[in-house]
A protein has these predicted regions:
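Short, low-complexity N-terminal tether/leader segments at secretion or assembly junctions of large
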Residues: 1-12, 91
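Noncatalytic modules at the cell exterior or secretory-pathway interfaces
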Residues: 37-39, 77-93
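Short, surface-exposed beta-strand/strand-loop-strand elements in extracellular ectodomains
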Residues: 42-62, 96-98
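Beta-sandwich interaction modules
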Residues: 67-81
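Positively charged, low-complexity terminal tracts
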Residues: 10-12, 96-100
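Intrinsic-disorder/low-complexity, polar/charged segments enriched in Ser/Thr/Lys/Arg/Asp/Glu/Gln
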Residues: 24, 36-38, 71-73
């Protein structure tokens, strides 16, 4: 039997707020941005194409990834934004990132 008590949690001191453009070739969404509590990834509502979100395996396999329609979002818990890749199904699209 364990008796655990949390006395304090430290909240991150910065907010991550980024909009990045992606084309039809997968790319890392941002480099060297530490994440503490996770991030929301949103396909910008004004996009005319769906986007795909995934890991580095999207570089070698174009069919991998989670599809987001314009306005859709997903919450991901990663330690750094350099673990998240994105691409547009067609043309260029914007991806919004919000987290801490």
């Amino acid at each position: 039997l364990f008796n655990t008590q949390v006395k304090q949690t430290k909240q991150p001191s910065t907010l991550i707020s980024i909009v990045t453009s992606v084309g039809s070739k997968a790319k890392v969404l941002s480099t060297n941005v530490d994440v503490h509590n996770g991030v929301y990834i949103q396909s910008h509502p004004s996009n005319s194409s769906n986007v795909m979100i995934g890991g580095a395996s999207m570089l070698s396999n174009t069919s991998l990834g989670h599809v987001l329609e314009p306005g859709d979002s997903v919450f991901l818990q990663v330690s750094n934004l350099n673990a998240i890749y994105g691409k547009s199904i067609s043309g260029n699209s914007n991806i919004s990132i919000l987290g801490s």
